[in-house]
Amino acid sequence: MAIPKVGINGFGRIGRIVLRNAILTGKIQVVAVNDPFIDLDYMAYMFKYDSTHGRFEGSVETKGGKLVIDGHSIDVHNERDPANIKWSASGAEYVIESTGVFTTKETASAHLKGGAKRVIISAPSKDAPMFVVGVNLEKFNPSEKVISNASCTTNCLAPLAKVINDTFGIEEGLMTTVHATTATQKTVDGPSKKDWRGGRGASANIIPSSTGAAKAVGKVIPALNGKLTGMAFRVPTPDVSVVDLTVKLAKPTNYEDIKAAIKAASEGPMKGVLGYTEDSVVSTDFCGDNHSSIFDASAGIQLSPQFVKLVSWYDNEWGYSHRVVDLVAYTASKD
């Protein structure tokens, strides 16, 4: 099968790290990038240098109005309206929508006007079908033109929840994600009309926040619909987050059996998506980890045979972007 040719709309944290993952894996070929707020020279600089993931090891240059990475030319567009981006002129059949702005079927489908065959939204969507690699890809229908890769937190939680529900059954559960700082937060206190706490300085505070990640699991695993909800704490770290899933199980069990089930999944059907560790790890140990979710066996606790707290780490930038690449490649293989 030919390598899928892809365009990226939005060259922010996810857009740039998706491009790094595309180059490193070779699963997709990025042929065009659109961002109305970043000119070509600045685009090259932002891709080459990264405070979290380090300097890009290959060559990065600009030539003839194009971004050239490791000798591969990428067309650059600066359109504000997605409908005006001529993806077909660059040969891009699939578009990764990573602005964080066009997250509905209607708005994201504007890319189809420029010649895209399918749009993959790198964020949760209110109405586009959501897919989590390792969890519900078998539900994908090639007729779907706009799909979502869900959120980084849903990608961490869903594989873990699937293993636990399939093996022991989940009656109900609460999730907390202790989440690294993201670009929407403020460096110092500033206005944030809809979320007053979210306007407080990111580096000075632990900030309680809402998240739809747990409820979204019910969309990708229908058996868990209405059984999970959750919240977030935004913390002053640059990257890597951790999910705390506390559940009431349908079947009584012990923690050793829970560990064994997750370990088996991590070495079998969810290999590469769900990781497993018994080491005494901390957040920075997972920076640049390709997994969606890495279960921390020594961090979880059990109160009773049916009540347990499970802990799983994720690089909310790198691991998620790796899955975006996987999802694009998978959907292209079905066309």
Swiss-Prot record:
Catalytic activity annotation: D-glyceraldehyde 3-phosphate + phosphate + NAD(+) = (2R)-3-phospho-glyceroyl phosphate + NADH + H(+)
Catalytic class of the enzyme: oxidoreductase
Active site: 152
Coiled coil stretches, renumbered: none
CDD domains tied to this protein: GAPDH_I_C, GAPDH_I_N
Signal peptide: none
Chain positions recorded as NAD(+) binding sites: 13-14, 35, 80, 316
A GO term, aspect molecular function: NADP binding
Residues annotated as site: Activates thiol group during catalysis: 179
EC number(s) recorded for this UniProt protein: 1.2.1.12
Any one of the GO CC terms: cytosol
Superkingdom of origin organism: Eukaryota
PROSITE patterns noted in UniProt: GAPDH (PS00071)
Annotated residues for binding of D-glyceraldehyde 3-phosphate: 151-153, 182, 211-212, 234
Family membership noted in the UniProt record: Belongs to the glyceraldehyde-3-phosphate dehydrogenase family.
Subunit structure, interactors included: Homotetramer.
Protein name according to UniProt: Glyceraldehyde-3-phosphate dehydrogenase 2
Organism: Schizosaccharomyces pombe (strain 972 / ATCC 24843) (Fission yeast)
